[in-house]
Curated annotation (Swiss-Prot):
Component of the ribosome, a large ribonucleoprotein complex responsible for the synthesis of proteins in the cell. The small ribosomal subunit (SSU) binds messenger RNAs (mRNAs) and translates the encoded message by selecting cognate aminoacyl-transfer RNA (tRNA) molecules. The large subunit (LSU) contains the ribosomal catalytic site termed the peptidyl transferase center (PTC), which catalyzes the formation of peptide bonds, thereby polymerizing the amino acids delivered by tRNAs into a polypeptide chain. The lineage of its organism: Eukaryota, Viridiplantae, Streptophyta, Embryophyta, Tracheophyta. This is Large ribosomal subunit protein uL18z. Keywords: Cytoplasm, Nucleus, Ribonucleoprotein, Ribosomal protein, RNA-binding, rRNA-binding. GO terms for biological process: ribosomal large subunit assembly; translation. GO terms for molecular function: 5S rRNA binding; structural constituent of ribosome.
Length: 304
């Protein structure tokens, strides 16, 4: 009966050992998915595959249109949820409704960049129903592939809120409605009313109402920023409608104005030039000579 045989990590083993890619070792990139999102047909020359990349942090949502080159990925356009205060949404910048706004902003921005914003206006009124952009006579719609990275693609995930925003904005992204918020697995169809509620922040409004009734003190702390801005549960839908209209009116990225750096107090001596050092030396020598001459005069007076 054979027992456990320990692997002998010899010199030959270490010489032939091949490490995985760095971002695989760090657990940041799914290369199985990436190779399928970036590999293009060999008969399509200089035609990149565009990816609609969505990533989330604790306080921000990032949406980008990216394409791969040998030198590295190139970001063609980007939109962030921290831009939404410019359009009237100052709180709740990481929820499903904010993800929709970020996707919509990116779609309108990239279409304006390509000169397609007038031809493909998308779905102006968000109804919650699935939407596919129809090709126009002259130019085809801008096509991209959804890149979710390592996000778990559960039904109702915020990444699909960003996808819905990009679709309504006029981008052509292959998709299914099975992962949108409101899809019912038993009935195998999307409940557009539930999805519409999520797009306009209705789920947040419901939570505000229930918490205000059950735990008023916690409500004051949890929704303090909403209350400071004067946002209540009843005005949530109207707020998001204004934000969507403002995004469509001007999707361009605003240039940030940076302040001039403040002048800091110097605690170390400034380095002198050669001429300054030479002049300083002459001054010190003159001072020494004058002091030496004064001492000689004092000695002569004492002798007298």
């Amino acid at each position: 009966m054979g027992g456990f045989v320990k692997t002998q990590k010899t010199n030959a083993y270490h010489k032939r050992f091949q490490v995985k890619f760095k971002r695989r070792r760090q657990g940041k990139t799914d290369y199985r998915a990436r190779i399928r999102l970036t590999n293009q047909d060999k008969n399509k020359y200089n035609t990149p595959k565009y990816r609609f990349v969505v990533r989330f942090t604790n306080k921000d949502i990032t949406a980008q249109i990216v394409y791969a080159t040998i030198a590295g990925d190139i970001v063609m356009a980007a939109a962030y949820s921290h831009e939404l205060p410019r359009y009237g949404l100052e709180v709740g910048l990481t929820n499903y409704a904010a993800a929709y706004c970020t996707g919509l902003l990116l779609a309108r921005r990239v279409l304006k960049l390509r000169g397609l914003d007038q031809e493909y206006e998308g779905n102006i009124e968000a109804t919650g129903e699935d939407y596919y952009v129809e090709p126009a006579d002259e130019r085809r719609p801008f096509r991209a592939l959804l890149d979710v990275g390592l996000i778990r693609t559960t039904t109702g995930n915020r990444v699909f809120g960003a996808l819905k925003g990009a679709l309504d904005g006029g981008l052509d992204i292959p998709h299914s409605d099975k992962r949108f918020a409101g899809f019912k697995k038993d009935e195998k169809q999307l409940d557009s009313d539930i999805h519409r509620k999520y797009i306009y922040g209705g789920h947040v409004a419901d939570y505000m109402r229930s918490m205000a009734e059950e735990e008023p003190e916690k409500f004051q702390a949890h929704f303090s920023e909403y209350l400071k801005k004067g946002i209540d549960a009843d005005g949530m839908e109207a707020l998001y409608k204004k934000v969507h209209a403002a995004i469509r009116a001007d999707p361009t990225m605003a240039k940030s104005t940076k302040k001039e750096p403040a002048t800091h107090k110097r605690y170390n001596l400034k380095k002198l030039t050669y001429e300054q050092r030479k002049a300083s030396l002459v001054e010190r020598l003159n001072a020494l000579n004058s002091s030496a001459g004064a001492d000689d005069d004092d000695e002569e007076e004492d002798d007298e």
